[in-house]
Curated annotation (Swiss-Prot):
SMART domains: RHOD
Database matches in InterPro entries: Rhodanese-like_dom (IPR001763), Rhodanese-like_dom_sf (IPR036873)
Residue ranges constituting the Rhodanese domain according to the UniProt record: 50-140
Pfam entry (one): Rhodanese
Top-rank taxon, per record: Bacteria
Name of protein: Uncharacterized protein BU052
Length: 144
C-alpha cells in the first residue's frame, strides 16, 4: 500500500492525465449511447434508403447541391431548417431521415430542430458527401 501511495505522490501529473482521459472516454461513450440520432456510414445509409424508404435531406447550399447530390435527396438548406421552413419534408415524418451536413459543428442544433419538428428517426451521414465520393458512390449533378 505504501508503494502505491509513493507512486501516486511522485507521478501526480501522469495520474491526472489518466483520470482526465478516463472521464472524457466515459463522457463521450455515454453521450453516444444516449443520443437520439445515430451517425451512419454510406452502406448503412444505402440499406436504410432501400429497405426502410429513408429520405435523404441535403442541408448544403443550393449551389453545392447542384454540384452533386445523392439520388432523390431533398435540398433544405441549414438556414431554412433553423427558420422552420421545412414544408418540403414535413410529409416524411414517419420515414427515417438521413441528414447530409456540410457544417459538422451545427450537427447537434440541427438534430434538435428535427426532433422539435416531430421527426423521430434521424440519422447523420458520417462525413457528409466526402466519403460518399471517396467510395465512388453515384451522385446526381444538376447544371440548371
Amino acid at each position: 500500500m505504501q508503494d502505491v501511495i509513493f507512486f501516486l505522490s511522485k507521478h501526480i501529473l501522469l495520474i491526472s492525465i489518466w483520470i482526465f482521459c478516463f472521464i472524457a472516454a466515459v463522457f463521450f461513450i455515454t453521450r453516444t449511447l444516449l443520443s437520439k440520432s445515430k451517425m451512419i456510414n454510406n452502406f448503412q445509409a444505402i440499406k436504410l434508403i432501400n429497405q426502410d424508404k429513408a429520405i435523404v435531406v441535403d442541408t448544403r447550399s443550393l449551389e453545392s447541391f447542384k454540384e452533386g447530390h445523392i439520388l432523390n435527396s431533398i435540398n433544405v438548406p441549414l438556414k431554412n431548417i433553423f427558420l422552420g421552413k421545412i414544408k418540403e419534408i414535413e410529409i416524411y415524418k414517419m420515414f427515417p431521415i438521413i441528414l447530409v451536413l456540410s457544417d459538422t459543428y451545427k450537427v447537434n442544433a440541427c438534430i434538435k430542430k428535427f426532433f422539435e419538428y416531430g421527426f423521430n428517426r434521424v440519422y447523420i451521414l458520417k462525413n457528409g458527401l466526402y466519403y460518399w465520393k471517396t467510395d465512388n458512390l453515384p451522385l446526381i449533378v444538376n447544371d440548371k
